[in-house]
Amino acid sequence: MIKYKIGDLLTAPQKCIAHQVNCQGVMGSGVAKAIRDEYPKVYKEYKEFSNYWIRTNKAMLPGYSQIVYTENKCIFNLFGQINYGYDGQRYTSYAHLAIALDRCFSEMCEIGETEIAIPYKMGCDRGGGDWEVVESILKDLSEKYNIDVYVYSLEGYVCR
């Protein structure tokens, strides 16, 4: 089930948060930058993990779901785009995002979590994806794993 909420993703009551990241080791804008600033440990582990795979076998990163535990949250870095840019191209790979989300939801079941918060238009604003496609992936996987997905939008943004 998907529920839409207006509010700050980083202060959401859900223990788990997921967001899309690129495979370049950069959290330079959007929600990724906000998470980097709020949770330095998440960025440190993402950077180390990305750099390791960039050096050894970069093909392993797309579709990966990295979980980082902080003091009060578990953050899932979803490797759904290989590159990034600001030129209007689509950098989000729906296939890689779906694989990462599938792994994320599977890991949630293993640790006993049933709710997750994600940003509205994940993979769409910065990644250039189509929200209807991403939303469809979320709906299918939330039903498959019986996970409640809370989609957060800051006040002033359109949210269903």
Indicate where each model-derived feature is located.
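Macrodomain-like recognition of ADP-ribose-binding/processing modules
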Residues: M1-R160
